[in-house]
């Protein structure tokens, strides 16, 4: 049975204002497992060498203990290997067992393969400290390059003992994929799910490659952000768990079949208040079988 966690990006406004207050609020809603979000530094800032709270490791460990929360992973961006090394050492001290690439963008197949070499190196560095490295997808990893999806190229060119995956089911659907089939392909390399829902009243193409994004062009961060900033219908195409159209129980069933340990709420956008939103999803998760 999967444990329910939350990606702290779900309360991003609170997180940016006061990360410790955000952690306390999330714990009071009832979330006992968190995946942290380490934001890229602003110009002139040094990168965060921890898990996004700006605290020394010993203090971070105590804070998690005080709130009765376990950090199960972290999302981060990696400017260089030295930053990665520092973060891994921090996580080892705090007791965070996984570290993830929040996103990456790819210009062509050769670029995918080059980045896979980096992922393998990050995976090896992580493994040496008893930590697992994983990749979190959006929709663009299912773009095809020379007849294969970026995701398949990644699977073929990363070491299954070093690089694992966190499947965001929503984003897979937005690329025209069946998350259950993707989970079957991942097998034991799948270690977490990300879950949200697709609004029932969303009336544009669900598959973003169906006339919204040109799958023949390279997809950059600007492409990605521009899509959602330019059209509110895209930017607001997220719903609380259980309020939309995704067959979430089928995802839970398959993940449990594969012995996936965590299903993690990630609410990219909400029309509700952040705490109201994550509380609603918390209650909705209780209605599904196979989640505790």
Per-range role (PLM):
Residues 1-98, 283-292:
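N-terminal pre-domain/capping segments
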Residues 6-8, 36, 74, 101, ...:
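Conserved beta-strand positions
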Residues 18-21, 48-59, 83-86, 110-118, ...:
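Alpha-helix N-cap and loop-to-helix initiation/capping positions
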Residues 33, 40, 70-165, 174, ...:
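Active-site acidic/histidine proton-transfer and metal-coordination neighborhood
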Residues 126-239, 245:
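Acidic/histidine-rich catalytic cores of soluble enzymes
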Residues 192, 261-268:
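Conserved active-site loop/cleft motifs that coordinate metal ions or position small ligands
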Residues 227, 240, 269-292:
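Aromatic-rich peripheral "rim/lid" segments of glycoside hydrolase catalytic domains that contact
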Residues 243-256:
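A short, acidic, amphipathic alpha-helical segment used as a generic capping/interface helix at domain edges
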